[in-house]
Structure formats: C-alpha cells, structure tokens
C-alpha cells in the first residue's frame, strides 16, 4: 500500500505562518502526499504554490469547536472553495448532538455539502468528547447525510483517533461513507492498524516520521 497518497499532510497550529505553509507544501511535493490540510486563510497561497501538481488542498470549517452559527460555516465553506480548496473538513456541532438535536446536525451537514457541490465533505465528530454509544449514533447520523467522509478528530482535544473509535465507526457507518482517521497518529504501526480497521485517509502532522518508518521497514527486506 502506498500510504503517501492517502495522507493529508497537516499543519493547523494557530501560530503557523505563510513560511511554515510553504515548507509544508514543499514536503508534500517531495514525498508525494495526496493532500495538505491547512487553515482557510492559507488556501489562496496553497493554490498558487501547488499549481501544476496533483496534491489536493483540504481546509477546515467551524474549526476546532464546531459551535459557529450554521450560516457562518456555510459562508466559510463557500469562500474556501472559491479560494481553491478541493475538500472541506467541517466540525459537527457537538453540543447540538449531545442534546439530541439530530435534525439540526443533518441540516447543517447537508447545507454545507450543497454549498460545495461535488467537492469532498468530511465531518469531524470529535470522538474524544463522545461515549462509545454516542460515537455509534454520530456515525449513523453522518451516514444519513450527503457527507463523503466521517473524520474522528480535530487533533485539538485531549486525544485523537483510537482503535475502539475505528471499530465502532466501521460497525455503524453506511457503505458509502468513508473514514478519515486523525489526531495523535504519530507512527506507521498506528496507520497500518487504522487502515486495517477501515480508514482510507489519514490526517497527521507527523507525516515525515511515518514515511521514515515506512522507508526503514522496506529497507529491512
């Protein structure tokens, strides 16, 4: 498996500068990562720097809390696409989910998907803040929408993706819904394990060390 092409090489630190983004982009080019994941403010820059490459631009909406007004999320998504984003990773409104306002969640996701059309939409459910039962319910809920992916984590909570998270999501998702694992993925072993559990995209800021793990493993044979 060529893991490089299913990695979203990620830099979402609030202190990231344009120079940091340019370094991220050069790393993505060097290692042929499938995508970079950056804050919306840097999408225009990335579009310019990634001209004539196949590297996708992923950006985040309603990040990292998910509690913005839905109309703001929609506008943010629309502007991100206009600036050159290929994919949107939006954060679910976790408070609304906790109080079981499921129709609100469905409407918000579908409105954003309508806003971005054929572009890929991933919904972050922030598994760290959910019980196993809630992860199952959130997975079923996202499966009932027009979203393309369910994503485990923002990377800004107290933990990221876990093996248990992936197992629950896999058991409860629809056939059409893909899985992106993110948050705390720091080594090849985690990535390989999550891949076996059904994840087909990975968000990580530790991409370079993971690729080194992969190269070292290949050199052993």
From Swiss-Prot:
- Give one Pfam family, short name only: DeoC
* One Gene Ontology cellular component: cytoplasm
Where's the active site on this chain? 89, 151, 180
Q: What domain of life?
A: Bacteria
> EC number(s)?
4.1.2.4
Q: Key word Nucleus present in the record?
A: no
Task: Provide this UniProt record's keywords sorted from A to Z.
Answer: Cytoplasm, Lyase, Schiff base
Question: What one GO molecular function would you report for this record?
Answer: deoxyribose-phosphate aldolase activity
Reaction catalysed by this enzyme: 2-deoxy-D-ribose 5-phosphate = D-glyceraldehyde 3-phosphate + acetaldehyde
User: Which pathway does it take part in?
Assistant: Carbohydrate degradation; 2-deoxy-D-ribose 1-phosphate degradation; D-glyceraldehyde 3-phosphate and acetaldehyde from 2-deoxy-alpha-D-ribose 1-phosphate: step 2/2
Main subcellular location of this protein, as a coarse class: cytoplasm
Indicate whether Nucleotide-binding appears among the record's keywords: no
Give the subcellular location: Cytoplasm
Q: Which InterPro entries match?
A: Aldolase_TIM (IPR013785), DeoC (IPR011343), DeoC/FbaB/LacD_aldolase (IPR002915), DeoC_typeI (IPR028581)
What's any GO biological process attached to this entry? deoxyribonucleotide catabolic process
Role noted for this protein:
Catalyzes a reversible aldol reaction between acetaldehyde and D-glyceraldehyde 3-phosphate to generate 2-deoxy-D-ribose 5-phosphate.
Family named by the database record: Belongs to the DeoC/FbaB aldolase family. DeoC type 1 subfamily.
PANTHER family the UniProt entry points to = DEOXYRIBOSE-PHOSPHATE ALDOLASE (PTHR10889:SF1)
Protein name stated in the entry: Deoxyribose-phosphate aldolase
Source taxonomy lineage? Bacteria, Bacillati, Mycoplasmatota, Mycoplasmoidales, Metamycoplasmataceae
- Please name the gene that encodes this protein: deoC
């Amino acid at each position: 498996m060529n893991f490089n092409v299913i990695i979203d090489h990620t830099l979402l630190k609030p202190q990231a500068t344009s120079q940091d983004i340019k370094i991220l982009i050069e790393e993505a080019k060097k290692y042929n990562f499938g995508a970079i994941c950056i804050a919306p403010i840097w999408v225009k820059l990335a579009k310019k720097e990634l001209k004539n490459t196949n590297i996708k631009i992923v950006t985040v909406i309603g990040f990292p809390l998910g509690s913005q007004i839905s109309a703001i999320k929609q506008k943010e998504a629309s502007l991100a696409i206009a600036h050159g984003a290929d994919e949107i990773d939006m954060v679910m409104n976790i408070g609304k989910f906790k109080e079981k306002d499921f129709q609100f969640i469905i409407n918000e996701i579908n409105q954003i998907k309508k806003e971005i059309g054929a572009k890929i939409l991933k919904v972050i459910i922030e598994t760290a803040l959910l019980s196993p039962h809630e992860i199952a319910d959130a997975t079923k809920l996202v499966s009932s929408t027009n979203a393309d992916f369910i994503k485990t984590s923002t990377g800004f909570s107290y933990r990221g993706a876990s093996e248990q998270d992936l197992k629950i999501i896999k058991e409860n998702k629809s056939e059409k819904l893909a899985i992106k694992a993110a948050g705390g993925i720091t080594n090849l072993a985690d990535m390989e394990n999550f891949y076996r559990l059904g994840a087909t995209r990975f968000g990580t800021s530790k991409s370079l060390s993971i690729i080194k793990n992969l190269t070292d493993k290949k050199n052993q044979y």
